[in-house]
Each structure stands twice: as C-alpha cells, then as structure tokens.
UniProtKB/Swiss-Prot annotation:
Gene3D superfamilies cross-referenced by the UniProt entry: 3.30.1320.10
A molecular function GO annotation: structural constituent of ribosome
Family: Belongs to the bacterial ribosomal protein bS16 family.
Keyword Ribosomal protein in record: yes
UniProt keywords, alphabetically: Ribonucleoprotein, Ribosomal protein
Name by which UniProt lists this protein: Small ribosomal subunit protein bS16
Keyword Ribosomal protein part of the UniProt annotation: yes
Length: 82
C-alpha cells in the first residue's frame, strides 16, 4: 500500500521533514517513490515552514495512496493558504 508520510531529516534537536510518497512496508526514512514537499516545524521569521505540491498529492490520492494523520493536517493547512 502506498502512503504519503513524513521522513525525518535535519540535525539533533532541529527536525526537518520531507513529505514523501512511499510503500508502507519501507522504513520511514528509507526508499521512497516521490518527494512532494517539506515541512519545517522550527521555521522562524521569513523562513518557509511548509511547501507542498498539492497537484501531486491529489494525483497520488486518486491512485489510492493514503495520507498519514500529520500529513492530512498539513494538506488541509496548505489548501487554506493556497
């Protein structure tokens, strides 16, 4: 099953997440199919906190991909901002 989820990157105490489309059997930071955006929870000031390619997310959802709980919240936030 294909899932759209967060893959943690960044340094210790400085999380940075890639939003990826991956097979649910792969590890969270392992092999992925496509990168559709990023989420920076520690963004301050003029830094971009969220970038998401909504067209690609909608494409994958139409193909049967499921969203993780946190990614579903981020998609809702991105749709409000767009």
């Amino acid at each position: 099953m294909v899932t759209i989820r967060l893959a943690r990157h960044g340094a210790k105490k400085r999380p940075f997440y890639q939003i990826v489309v991956a097979d649910s059997r792969n590890s969270a930071t392992g092999r992925f199919i496509e990168k559709v955006g990023f989420f920076n929870p520690t963004a301050t000031g003029q830094e971009e906190g969220l970038r998401l390619d909504l067209d690609r997310v909608n494409h994958w959802v139409s193909q049967g991909a499921s969203l993780s709980d946190r990614v579903a919240q981020l998609v809702k936030t991105a749709q409000k901002a767009a």
